[in-house]
Amino acid sequence: MAQQQQQQQHHHHLQHQQQQQQQQQLQHHSNLLLLQQQQQQQQQQQQQQQQLLQQEQQLQQYDNNLYSQNYNMEEYERRRRREREKYERQQGIQSDDRETSLFSEPRRLTEGDAEITAALGEFGDARNYINQYTVGISRHAPGGGSGNGSIGNNPRLQAPMIQQQVSSSISSSASVASSLLPPGLGQTQQQQQQQQQQQQPRPPTYLKQADNKPPYNGRGGYPGQPMKNDIPSSSGMAPPRGPPKLNSNSSSITNNAAASSSSSLLGPPISTQVPNGREKSFLGPPTTGTALHNGGGRFAQPVSNKRPGVGIQPPPPQEKDVRSMLSEMKNHFQVTPLNPIAATPQAPTRENYNLNAPNKFKYAFDIVDPIMPLLNSPPSVTPSSLITPIAPMTSPIAPLLTTPPQASQLPLGSGSGNGAAISATSLSTTTAAAAAAAAVAGVAATVAATVAPIQQLPPTPPKAMSVTPPTAKPLKIEKNPILEKQDSCLENDLELSESEDERKKDGRSPGSSSNGSESDSTESGSESSSKGEHNHHHHHQQQQQQTQQQQLHGHHPQSHHHQQFLQQQLQRQQQQQQQQQQLTANGGKKKYSQTIIASGANTITGLLTSSGGLGSSSGNNSSGGGGGSGNGGTTSSSSGGSMGGSGGSSSSGGASGGGGGGGGSGSSSGIGSGSSSNKTPSPTDSNKWNLSRFFHKPTSQTSSESVSPGNVSMKVPGILPGGAQIIPESIDVTTAIVKNEKIHHDDHLMDIDECDEDDDDVDEQHQQLRYGAGLSVTPVAVKKEEDLGLLTAAAIPKSQIKRESETQISHQRLSESATSGSSSSSCSSSDSAASASEVVPMPGPGETLQIPGVPAAITSVMRVPPINNMQKSQSMSVTVTPIAPLPASPKPRQKKPRKKKMMSVLTPPLLDSSDEDEPSTKHSSLVVAQAQAAVVPPPSTNSTTTSATTTKKGRGRPRKQQQQQSAGSGNLSSASAGSSSQAKGPTLTAAKKTLVKASASSSTSNTNSSSVLPRKREHSSQSSSNGNTPTKKMSSIPMMPAAAASAAATLLQPPAVAAANAVAASSSSSDEESSSSSCSTSKSSSSSSSSDDTETQKTNCRIVKLNKTVPVTAAMAPLAKRSSYHRRSGSSSPTSSSSETDKPNSNSHNNLGIAAISNSNSNSNNNVIVNNNLQQQAMPQQSPYKVPLSGGSQQLSSSDSSSSSSGSSSSSGDEDDAKREKNRERKPKSDKNKISTLTRIFNNKEGGAKKQGQVVIIDQSEEQLQQQQQQQQQVQIRDPLPPPSLLSQSGGVKQRMTPTQQQQLGAGLASPARTTTPLLTSLICKIDLSKLSRERILRLKKLAPSSSNQQNGHLTPNGHVVQGGSSPAGLSKVKHEHHQLHHHSQQAHSHPVKPEPELDSLYETKFRPTNVKQEFQLKQERDRDRNRERDQQQQPPPRRRKRSSSSSSSPYKEKKRKKEKTDPMLTNAKDQMLQINPMLLPSNNHERLSYDKYQLLQEDAAAAAAAAAAVAVVNSSNGQKLFQSSIGGGTGATAVGPLSIMAPSTCSEAVQTTPPTSVTGAGAPASLVSQPPPPPRLIYRSYFDREEEHPSDDLRKSKQFLQEAVQRKHAADSERDSFNQVTLYLEAVAYFLLTADAMERCSSETATWTMYKDTLSLIKFISSKFRPYQQSANCQQETHNKVAILSLRCQSLISLKLFKLRRVNCRAIINSLTDFFRNGRGDIVNGNTPSSISPSNSVGSQGSGSNTPPGKIVPQDIHNQLCKQNEYLTYVNSAHELWDQADRLVRTGNHLDFFRELDHENGPLTLHSTMHEVFRYVQAGLKTLRDAVSHPTHQSQ
């Protein structure tokens, strides 16, 4: 047992041991396995670590190499890189953004470049988005990746967003590496990697190492340096909504993490930055497959979202990302275009890439929609303080694009949202403009950086502005250079100031707030950068943001709440900025209040783009004028709307942005404005399209653009498609309108409030102004009918809104610079409110400009249709001129007008927008001139001098000055000079300067515009207060004189041009004044201008009709008084350019106290305007010196005919009228009726024009208007021409429909009750149009028919003066008759308006040309009629009566009648014109029409001169006819002399073809008719009109030719002189050709063929024989070369003839051969014998002598056919080869002139020429050559 137990124990022990051993073994084995696994893992880890280290080392080495390379580069290259880097930093451009992009761009291009941005801006955003969301390249690390902002970012660029998904500390590259590593090692390795990367010295680059302190005090300058990303709240944006940044926000941490991660795997390549700080598109050697997964590290890793690592938190589903990407792409691209355009002052939404106006629409996707989607897009990441760093990107678009890299630094929950928020923040931080752009750019940025909900933008702008306004840099993508220029950093850059085009485009800012944001801020930056730079930027941002918000609001209801929030923020910012502006400029407060008021409207989409509302609100804030933002806003941004009033002024209206308010703004910023003014010209230039593209593009405006008011909310200011301005009737709008009216007064008073208000109104009006006549029509277009017609641009055309302003608009758009600038310039100059209006960008075709205070209907003027506008412009030139100023309201004129004039002086910046060259100087001059104008008496020659002065200061000059300018320079010259000057940069000058007559027409438009605008504004002011209303009238009238001056120029020009000018004036005046009142005045003024008696005469006609109906004497006395007073003032201040302009205006337009009104006194000016209107009737005699000038100008306008007729009657009548005008001046309360009328018109309850949607502006005081309004309401309701009756009813004051319209609009602006005048629009429009056109025509006709006295007796300076003070009815009758006669003579003379009998004077405006051609033709007809009238002076009046009655009977019927008459007459007129002045026809239609107008005006003036012995007619090359009434006497004569001298210069501008000539008395007609010999006209004939030759078939004839040929050949054989020999040979060849040609008809084909073939051989022999002579260096070389060319032509034609003779055979051969080759007939042979193709038949079996290659057997007939075919086709080939050879010889030998002469004399020789033509051509050429050889001096080449 014991043993057993022992054994068992032992056994157990053994078992135990065995078990232990087994366990040990198992343990050991397991340990070994573990060890092996561990070792393997360790090895793997080591390998991976080594790989990572190697990659990092490689990347580091690569970076170091790059760095060393960079520093080893040549000094020049380094310096260039540094400069570029600095430039990019300054502009907020991320070089890495550009270079790391998927599509690398040439280094030489910088996205910041304006042109490149315009061309690629959209592309840049799209590229950024693609890089970030699709390819994974993230220039903006945080923004690039939706989840992992940091993975794909260039560490240097910005610390990539720490991968929030994985760990805050792990960089995106680390996450990528971890994803490659085993799951267990991923995080550790990532951490290690991150640590290593952080520890590793960052590759030396220009980027400042992240130290939580962005370079340049947080402004961030290095492309890769994060912009204060570590400061979460620095941006002032709401905290980011996305997951919190894992890495500390500190830029150093973010940068380090991003840098380390990117450097390890992807970072270095992605962010590889050249030492210059710019990232290289090449990221360096691929570190690993992982690094390359992204494309060799070239593209930023999509961030873990797109490629989640094993250890990294999975990103959101890719599908979702893809969908979001697609939606973002779609939204962004739509929105993104806005961002670049946001840089432009226009509505950023649509015109992001407005950097160059032409590109405005190229790259804009419906930005409004995209913005809304962005807003709608979830604000996954609200921009946090990080966003603020982005703020440095100033340019709205560029910042967004650039922001993404910075945004990538931001710890945004969602990259996309983050990027957008960042960009928005950075934008807002950068500037208000940037913020505004950021709102748009926010969308773009969202695309680039990620979808950043725009919702973030609203929060971002406030903080961003406060946090980084200075830091904000424009991004490359954006128009940063422009914004940069605002900062004055970019001023040196080529973006804005470098190129006038860009500056003009930027200058569009006056035209559109969106555009203006960058460009305006740039302007303000360069001009008043220090003063309002930040404010300006903020304002721009606010404006842009508001615009974007509005757009979003209008287009994306979903984000409406968000938009509201943004708007609130923007409003707060604007308020703050406005406060700053207030500090900066006097108008700041007003602007601010106006902004608040306009903000509501601005929110509306219409204002957004139209620059009325949004522009107005932001503009008011930013540009010291509501107009500043949208219209002035744009302008104001350009003017540095932030600058305050100055900013507003500074941009072409940026003022104008101040507009009137810009005026206020301009005036408050008057000084700053001066600076801005310099850039303003470019804005004006840009205005031409700025307005169109700003207003075309804006989505919000698009809705406003709807033809029907239904589309455009009447509560939302906007521009209807027709160009009518919608002035909301809402309380806010009313307030704005009231403010505007006040602004008119204040402008006269130079009140900041009024300036601001004016800016609001003016902004919108200014937009219209920008469109040339759009503004003018705005008031007119108020009528709802027009809203529908606006789209067609024909609805208004009717008597209602027949506004030539539309025509003008098209004119202006065509000649954007010339007409538009002129209009805006005029508006701005004439009225400070108008000047603000100038800033208001006119909507593009189909767009509506919304004026906050004006009812939508009022604004629904057809601005958009440029073509229609052009047509209307000519016929309705006057139409645009509102009648508002006409009613004599001495009280307002004296007081308010003066202030307004002062505002006008301040307004010069607005003018500046039109005149780029002399904006600030003009501005100063304007102010001084205004001051002086009051003192300076109007010298008779002033008008002449003024034209030059005006030209100099046209731009900066306020409307007053502009009026004065036009009037001052002999009206035409002043109008063309002043208007051109004003439009110097942009509108008027461009199109109209081509032909000075066009320029004069433009000038007239401008002048009218100015005149109208002052009226408008003055009328507005007047409507506000009784005294004011007359003042407004005066202002308008002074404008009218300016317009008249321009009209005078136009008179010489065809009425169409005058009409166009009037339209320009009308549109500008309309824009400047309340839209409604402006329109009326514009029309009146325009009418005057087109009449060519100068606006004064036209105004007189209208005023006389309206004012005379109302006590003409009462109105005239004050007017005359004012006129004389202003005359004195104007004269006294001739030294100052403004003063000079003023007094010339005064002189030119006696009736135009305008000159004086504009320049001399605001109050006095307004009064003078009214007085001038009356004076035109009564004053001409009173102020003969002024009258002569005025007369001359007026003659250009419609005053010509009425000038002569009223010449004698005006002497006595003028003095009385002048006295009456003076009396009226003394009766400031005489405008009570006017005020009441306006009030009623604007009161909805009263059923006035407002209810009707028509704005009737009466020239009377507001009291009078109110009294008359009741009457007018009925009349107006019936038709748009009631104002005449109202005027007659108004008692002492003459009410013009046009003035009524202005007054109504102004009244609406002045009094909230009147604010709602939507219905007034149509009424006003109708009245203005008919009145203007008829008035002008009447005057022209009157000049011819009535020698001394006419009912319409034109007051030489003042316009038509009824002889004894004829009743308005009589005057209107005369006008009607004249107009009708004019129409008949012109065949409906482009006045399709249907006048209504009640509104005779007003009804004239109804006539408007259907098109420019029609007007041109009508004018020609009128010329013929005038000639008849000269023979039979008494006949025309009856005709006129007949026509007037017919026209007044029914507008539609009359239109139809006119059309019927016009169609045949147009043809006749055309033929006549061609016959009479074929050479005078300008190159283009517009010029041609202008010339026609000029001609017609000349004829009218001549007729008038012939008719009126008392009137002295001075015809200058300008085509200006200066009529001096006998009253003028010596003074008149003196004035005439200087005027005639000045007129020629102006005239030359207007009509280049007419040499300056001055004639007086009877000589005038001859000089008028006499014109320089027309240049040779090119005659083109149809190919089928060739002469059909019927050569004799007589064989004897061919024999005769043959004998001649043989004789010459034999003579040539014996000739020794080489030249004679060659010519004889060639003659022989010509006769041989004639012989062969005759043989074709009588001989066999073979004989003919032989003859041609032999002839070809002969000529070839001759050519070869004389070829050496062609190469000789002697004097005969050229002659031999010419002979050789003739020879080659002959050879070519003979070759072609040989082919034609065999064409039938050739066709048969071709068919046979085609059949042969198609069927494959013929045997294939290897050798000589036909056989199979077997190898046996190859060389071996063939004979040794047979080396024929294998081929196909061709039958003999086929071979013969091939030979024949070759022969025939060779002829064809030779024919063309020889012909081309001859052509080359012609060019290389410089013989073009010689052969051109031959072609002109003998018809061109072509391959279709017959042999007879060849013979004639060759004989003529040889004869010329012989003559040249015989008479070398006459040798022609």
Curated annotation (Swiss-Prot):
Biased amino acid composition, Low complexity: 16-25, 162-179, 187-200, 247-264, 509-529, 542-552, 564-583, 815-837, 927-951, 961-1013, 1034-1049, 1056-1091, 1130-1139, 1157-1173, 1189-1212, 1267-1276, 1727-1747
Pfam families assigned: AFF4_CHD (PF18876)
Disulfide cross-links: none
Residues within the DNA-binding region(s): 952-964
GO CC list: nucleus; super elongation complex
Biased composition (Acidic residues): 490-500
Gly residues composition-biased segments: 612-633, 641-673
Family indicated by similarity: Belongs to the AF4 family.
The protein's name in its UniProt record: AF4/FMR2 family member lilli
Annotated organism of origin: Drosophila willistoni (Fruit fly)
Originating gene: lilli
